[in-house]
Design a protein with these regions (language model features):
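All-alpha prenyltransferase/terpene-synthase fold signal
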Residues: 1-428
Length: 428
C-alpha cells in the first residue's frame, strides 16, 4: 500500500530544496518581505517610496552572498531543524540581509566611501541625482572626521524642514543624510520582519535575545572603529575587539546561534557552534582587512588602500607598527606615520605601505592567523553529533570559505564546494 505523505514529509522536502540553494531561497523570501514594505512606503509618500525605500530594496537585492542567512540555515540543519522551522529560519535570514544593508549604507557614509559592490554607494547615488537636478558641483571631499560621522544625523534633524535652497544644503550633505535615513529604514524593516515571524514557543525568547544582542554589538563595533581612527589607536588587542564586534559576531556567530536556537539545540551543541562561529567570524574580518590593502578592486568592488587613507587601526596596521617599533625600523614607522589618515594618498604611497606590511612580516602573520582561526573553527565541529552529516559538511566548508582559508575535507567526508566569500564585494 502506498504510504500517505504527511506534513512532516512535506517539511522535509522543503528543507532539502533549500539545502540545494540556500541563497536562492533567501532571495525569494526577501522578495516577498520587500514587496510588502515597498507598498507601505509608497502609501506613506510616493517620493519617499521612490527615493529611499526603492533604493533600500535595490541595494538589498543587488548583491552579496547571503552569508548570514546561510549560517542561520546550516546552524538550523546541523542541529536537526528544518521542516516546520524552515520558514522562520528563512525570514530570519531575510531580516539579517536588511541589517547588513543598514550596516553597509551607514558604513559608507561614515567612511566617505564612493563605491560599494562596484557601483556608486547609496549616498553617492543620491548626491549624483540631486546634483544633476540643481546643477551643483560636488565639493572636493576632505578627510572624514569622527565628529562629523556622529553629528550628521543631528544636523539633518535640525534642517529637515527647510529646502536645499533656503538651508544652503548641498547635494553632498543631502546624499549623506538621505543614506542615513535609508539605513535606518533597512534596520526598521529588519526588526519588523523578526517581530512578524512566528517562532516556536520554545525558541522565541532565545532568538529575540540573540537578535537584540547582535544589534547592540554591531553598533558598538562601528563606534570602536570610528574611535580608533580619531584616537589613532595602535593596540592590536583593540583592533581584534573592534573586528569581533563590528563584523565577526553579527556575520557568523550570532546567525549560527539563531539557527541552533530555532532547532532547539542543547547547550553543548550551541557552545560548539558559538566557538566555531567566533573563530571564523574573526578570520572573516581579518581577511577583509587584507583584501582592503592587497585585494584586486575589480574583484572586491572597492578601491584598494582606502583603509590606509582613512587611518583605520586594523589588526594588519597595528601589527605592522608593533613589529617596526620592536625592530627599531624608523623607515617603516615613517612610512606608516606619513600615510595613515591621508585622504589624498597616492597609489605609489599606498604601494610603499604595502611594502612595509610585507617587510615587517605583518602580512604573513595575518595570513597565518587567518589559517589558524579557520582550523580552530572547524575543529569545534569535530565532536558534534548530528543526524545530518551532509549539513555538517556544508557548514564545515562554509566556515572555511568565509574565513578566506584553504578548503580541506571535513572528518568523515569529501570537501563541499562553496563559493569563496569576497568580503569587500559586499559582505563586509
Amino acid at each position: 500500500m502506498r504510504r500517505i505523505r504527511t506534513a512532516d514529509d512535506q517539511g522535509t522536502d522543503q528543507a532539502r530544496a533549500v539545502d540545494a540553494d540556500v541563497a536562492g531561497a533567501v532571495e525569494r523570501v526577501l522578495d516577498e518581505v520587500l514587496g510588502a514594505r515597498l507598498a507601505e512606503a509608497a502609501a506613506a509618500d510616493a517620493l519617499f517610496g521612490r527615493d529611499i525605500a526603492e533604493r533600500v530594496a535595490r541595494f538589498t537585492l543587488g548583491g552579496g552572498k547571503r552569508l548570514r542567512g546561510r549560517f542561520v540555515w546550516w546552524g538550523l540543519r546541523v542541529c536537526g531543524g528544518g521542516g516546520e522551522t524552515a520558514g522562520a529560519a528563512l525570514r530570519l535570514a531575510a531580516a539579517l540581509e536588511l541589517v547588513q544593508t543598514c550596516a553597509l549604507v551607514h558604513d559608507d557614509v561614515m567612511d566617505g566611501a564612493e563605491l560599494r559592490r562596484g557601483r556608486p554607494a547609496l549616498h553617492a547615488e543620491v548626491r549624483g541625482q540631486y546634483a544633476q537636478q540643481s546643477g551643483q558641483e560636488r565639493p572636493v571631499r576632505s578627510a572624514e572626521t569622527f565628529g562629523r560621522s556622529v553629528e550628521t544625523a543631528g544636523r539633518f534633524t535640525e534642517t529637515s524642514g527647510r529646502s536645499a535652497e533656503t538651508s544652503g544644503r548641498s547635494a553632498e550633505s543631502f546624499g549623506r543624510s538621505a543614506a542615513i535615513l535609508a539605513g535606518d529604514l533597512a534596520l526598521a524593516w529588519a526588526d519588523d520582519t523578526v517581530m512578524d515571524t512566528s517562532f516556536p514557543a520554545s525558541a522565541r525568547s532565545a532568538v529575540h535575545a540573540l537578535w537584540r544582542t547582535m544589534r547592540t554589538e554591531m553598533v558598538a563595533g562601528q563606534y570602536l572603529d570610528l574611535h580608533g581612527q580619531v584616537t589613532a589607536c595602535r593596540s592590536p588587542a583593540r583592533a581584534v575587539r573592534t573586528a569581533r564586534l563590528k563584523s565577526a559576531r553579527y556575520s557568523v556567530e550570532r546567525p549560527l546561534l539563531m539557527g541552533a536556537a530555532l532547532a532547539g539545540a542543547d547547550d553543548r551543541t550551541a557552545g560548539a557552534l558559538r566557538s566555531a562561529g567566533r573563530c571564523a567570524g574573526l578570520a572573516f574580518q581579518l581577511h577583509d582587512d587584507l583584501l582592503g590593502v592587497f585585494g584586486d578592486p575589480e574583484k572586491t568592488g572597492k578601491p584598494s588602500g582606502d583603509d590606509i587613507r582613512e587611518g583605520k587601526p586594523t589588526y594588519l596596521t597595528t601589527v605592522a607598527r608593533a613589529r617596526a617599533e620592536a625592530a627599531g625600523d624608523d623607515g617603516a614607522l615613517g612610512v606608516l606615520d606619513a600615510a595613515l589618515g591621508d585622504p589624498d594618498l597616492s597609489a605609489a604611497a599606498v604601494d610603499r605601505v604595502r611594502d612595509v606590511f610585507v617587510s615587517t612580516g605583518a602580512r604573513a602573520a595575518l595570513e597565518d592567523k587567518i589559517e589558524t582561526l579557520a582550523d580552530r573553527s572547524t575543529a569545534y565541529l569535530a565532536g558534534l553529533r548530528t543526524a545530518d552529516p551532509a549539513a555538517l559538511r556544508h557548514l564545515h566548508a562554509l566556515l572555511r570559505a568565509t574565513a578566506g582559508a584553504r578548503p580541506h575535507a571535513p572528518p568523515g567526508g569529501s570537501p563541499v564546494t562553496v563559493p569563496v566569500v569576497a568580503a569587500r564585494a559586499g559582505e563586509r
